[in-house]
Amino acid sequence: MKTFILLTKLAPDISRQMKDRAKLGRNWLDLVKAKCPEVKFISHYALLGPHDFLDIYEAPDEESAAKVSMISLANGAFQAETLIAIPYKQFLGLTKEISKQVKKNSSDF
């Protein structure tokens, strides 16, 4: 499974519905679980800044991640941005692989 991060900004009219926030959030999560049962949520945070929420979740592929984003946009999000997260150890492995290739290519000159 791949790790994804979803940053959302709610539409202004939805942001004003503070008393209904828990219900709206539960409805969104239930819909995602129904439409994307393969997605596993890891963390959910409310943010102070340009985005309202950050979700960290695992999904098998980019198509599943796109569905989560589209469900968010169809249910009150004004903006949704999905990022793929690479585990740090895996990232370090990529840097070693690239370094070897760069070194090999530079010796070809």
Where are these regions (language model features)?
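An amphipathic, aromatic/His-enriched active-site/gating alpha helix that lines ligand/cofactor pockets
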Residues: 59-89
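Glycine-rich, flexible loop/turn motifs
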Residues: 14, 44, 82
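Short S/T/G/P-rich N-terminal loop/turn motif that feeds into the first structured element of a domain
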Residues: 1-37, 89-109
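Short, glycine- and small/hydrophobic-rich beta-strand elements in well-ordered beta-sheets
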Residues: 29-53
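Short secondary-structure transition/capping segments
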Residues: 51-54, 83-97
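Short, well-ordered beta-strand segments in beta-rich or mixed alpha/beta enzyme
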Residues: 5-9, 45-68
